[in-house]
């Protein structure tokens, strides 16, 4: 186990992917929970309306993004392994201003529509990231590599995302009132540039570090 862990974190590309995937999960879990609250507080939707809108529009968008990410990785990475992560990196950078616009507009229907494309783009990293992780280590360490990414996503993403989003929202109430969640989401939208940067950094290391695939 110790040898596998050392091998996994001895790869700079893996470390960059680990950071990017964990931070993406942090933002995704936080936005996923509090976007529903945002539509209720800011746009006046009922719990049922907000939940249904998110489930149909953003749920389907997430599925499309996951499939599209794998397809684009296969296409762009066929001749150059560095491009396995090009689509996720570029997509997340493009998603940031679109997310901000979705949280900014006053019409909830326009907001939902604007959130669909960035949701697709932000979900596109799953397949490429896990594929790269498997190729960065020997077969004996692949299970450990995948489990470390899942561990980071759950600890940082699920464990901290919703909690910190909620704490920040509470802190902003004196300033923003019922729009406090909206302001947290404004910030979260632009923070998507961070995982985009780390996926890009990882892509620069892939050609040198990939052991297989």
Predicted regions and their residues:
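A late C-terminal transmembrane helix in Major Facilitator Superfamily
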Residues: 66, 136-174
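Interfacial helix-cap and linker-helix signal at transmembrane-aqueous boundaries
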Residues: 39-40, 72-73, 77, 164-174
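Cytoplasmic membrane-interface "Motif A"-like loop-to-helix N-cap segments
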Residues: 74-91
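Extracytoplasmic gate region of multi-pass secondary transporters
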Residues: 6-69, 122-130, 157-165
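Hydrophobic core of transmembrane alpha-helices in multi-pass small-molecule transporters
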Residues: 109-126
